[in-house]
């Protein structure tokens, strides 16, 4: 996890290179064997309150977000990376109150 302070004074939380095995792909063999996907998440968070109070309850629980994404991806079975990405974004927004997210999903073995 990294936090970057932007010019507009909004912080950004990064969760990078989550490597997760899942069923993904359109070919018959891809529906039978788990493949590794790599996921990067980037989302805004105002860290001022957490920094001022030094209290965990005022911070974003990025470990819970990472664990939630890992569990979801491991249990999923999509054909397209695009569908997986959309579903991850919805999960993070709905379950963790994140308003916007930048997301990268790649399948290293695909190329």
Model-flagged regions — what are they?
Residues 2-111:
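N-terminal, polar/charged subdomain of small-to-medium soluble alpha/beta proteins
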């Amino acid at each position: 996890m990294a936090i970057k302070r932007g010019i507009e004074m909004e912080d950004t939380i990064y969760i990078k290179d989550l490597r997760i095995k899942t069923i993904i792909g359109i070919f018959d063999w891809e529906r039978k064997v788990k493949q590794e996907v790599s996921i990067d998440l980037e989302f805004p968070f105002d860290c001022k309150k957490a920094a001022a109070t030094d209290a965990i309850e005022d911070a974003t629980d990025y470990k819970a977000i990472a664990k939630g994404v890992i569990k979801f991806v491991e249990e999923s079975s999509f054909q397209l990376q695009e569908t997986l990405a959309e579903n991850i974004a919805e999960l993070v927004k709905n379950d963790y109150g994140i308003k916007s997210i930048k997301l990268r999903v790649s399948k290293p073995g695909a190329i």
